[in-house]
Regions:
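Phosphate-handling active-site elements
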Residues: 30-39, 62-77
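Buried hydrophobic packing segments
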Residues: 22-26, 57-65, 113-117
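Short alpha-helical scaffolding segments that buttress acidic/His motifs in well-ordered protein cores
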Residues: 22, 40-45, 78, 113
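Active-site-proximal helix-loop elements at catalytic-domain edges
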Residues: 1-27
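Glycine/serine-rich anion-binding loops at beta->alpha junctions
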Residues: 44-60
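Glycine/charged-rich beta-loop-alpha catalytic/anionic-binding loops adjacent to active sites
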Residues: 1-7, 36-43, 93-97
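Acidic-glycine-rich active-site phosphate/pyrophosphate-binding loop
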Residues: 23-41, 83-91
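C-terminal binding/interaction regions
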Residues: 69, 76-125
Length: 125
């Protein structure tokens, strides 16, 4: 595991929401404080949105790190890879709320989001 994946998982283990865990692990990439990261993450957490909060947090980082077309391309790549791994980016589907079949745990989504995000940032093209 890379440092940012480890950080994200540790934040989640300590009680941070999925979105707060990912945003805090990568907050230095977009020059925001922990308070700003927690504030930005709050509306994304706990199934409040359709998409998984860990996915939304990663997209927030990409949107704030890159401009226009580059951000949109990286977000598209992120969603494609996350979906290939987990079959969905939709929180209800990942948690198996309607089907009873859990596709990925919240911690797994945090780890996957952090890993994919790290790769997209590292491959700065």
């Amino acid at each position: 595991m890379t440092e940012n994946i480890t950080k994200a998982v540790e934040y989640h283990k300590s009680g941070f929401s999925c979105s707060a865990a990912v945003l805090n692990a990568f907050r230095d990439e977009i020059s925001i404080s922990e308070i700003q990261a927690m504030s930005a993450a709050k509306p994304m957490a706990g199934g409040r949105m359709i998409k998984c909060g860990a996915v939304l947090a990663a997209e927030y980082v990409l949107r704030n790190k890159y401009d226009g077309d580059t951000a949109e391309r990286k977000i598209s790549e992120f969603e494609q890879e996350f979906t290939e791994r987990n079959k969905s980016v939709v929180c209800r589907e990942l948690k198996g709320i309607d089907t009873g079949k859990i596709l990925r745990s919240c911690r797994g989504c945090v780890s996957d989001s952090a890993g994919i995000l790290e790769k997209l940032i590292r491959d700065n093209v």
